[in-house]
Amino acid sequence: MASKTVLFNKHLESKAKMVDFHGWEMPINYGSQIEEHHAVRQDAGMFDVSHMTVVDVTGSDACAFLRKLLANDVAKLTVPGKALYGGMLDENAGIIDDLITYYLTDTHYRVVVNSATRDKDLAWINKQAAAFDVVVTERPELAMIAVQGPNAKAKAATVFSAEQNAAVEGMKPFFGVQSASLFIATTGYTGEAGYEIIVPETEAEALWQALLDAGVKPCGLGARDTLRLEAGMNLYGQDMDESINPLAANMGWTVAWEPSERDFIGRDALTAIKAAGTDKLVGLVMEEKGVLRHDMAVFFTDADGVEHQGVITSGSFSPTLGYSIAMARVPSGIGAIAEVEMRKKRVNVKVIAPSFVRNGKQAF
């Protein structure tokens, strides 16, 4: 039996088409994925992300534990509320999950992990926590609503209390603040400004309705996927998993190599991979007709005339750009042009850094 979020009935009220998403009954769209996508790029849309897993890490060793657990370094977080993104690696430097960590106090951090990886994440975190003076607490009583788009903050402001508006005023990206019952963070998965709001389940329906009344359009997983792909953001299980290291997933920037004495899990393996060289994740753009899709083969010829092959990890039509885009894992040495095999013929594609749209505009 699929799990339902606390907002399930609100989705049905808005005529959502529900699908099974890793054991959760979630809205794929509310009638038009394209309209929902454009709402986020041009105005404001919201997503039920209550299936995400919120974990609080507390205790005197909280910082030391997370410095061991994560490839990014939480010691960089010194201002309460500041967050960072990064990978949780196994000993072979494979990505167990990608996650966001918020620094609340020296003895309290909040970690948000993916829903599809919840069970293995919690098992891994608890196993590693045994050697530290920490308490790992899952927070299933919390729901989460993402409000995204150029007008998202203004529309959310009409719903927030005066105290909450004061708390978020001037807040930079990748920060979170607890104000009354809401934990409001300037994070997202769309390439637009906005908030991810962690709210007690008992208040989630009222918050969703208030945002609806403020003119925020409900958006499903379909639009969420095309938005995150345009923004060049990875989807766990598709663009990376435990067989992939962060350097091959465009996550090298999230690995904190300094200080060199910090012995995070997977460091030795990743050091060896870095020295040997690894595949990389690139963006592909195809301006002719057709749609680039997951698992299609990518071919290119290097400077020495040797042909290499890679694979598309995520691909879709881009509603913002009007043609197809993709992310692909390829051997290093790829140039500005490659070919993708479609319907038994090869089609030329442009190769770019994997970021296509930012703040509603073409990013390349």
UniProtKB/Swiss-Prot annotation:
Gene, per the UniProt record: gcvT
Keywords: Aminotransferase, Transferase
SUPFAM superfamilies: Aminomethyltransferase beta-barrel domain, Folate-binding domain
Function noted in UniProt: The glycine cleavage system catalyzes the degradation of glycine.
Subunit structure: The glycine cleavage system is composed of four proteins: P, T, L and H.
GO biological process: glycine decarboxylation via glycine cleavage system
Protein name: Aminomethyltransferase
GO CC field: cytosol; glycine cleavage complex
Record-stated family: Belongs to the GcvT family.
GO molecular function terms listed in the Swiss-Prot or TrEMBL record: aminomethyltransferase activity; transaminase activity
EC number: 2.1.2.10
Stored HAMAP family: GcvT (MF_00259)
Catalytic activity: N(6)-[(R)-S(8)-aminomethyldihydrolipoyl]-L-lysyl-[protein] + (6S)-5,6,7,8-tetrahydrofolate = N(6)-[(R)-dihydrolipoyl]-L-lysyl-[protein] + (6R)-5,10-methylene-5,6,7,8-tetrahydrofolate + NH4(+)
Any Pfam family the entry gives: GCV_T_C
Source organism superkingdom: Bacteria
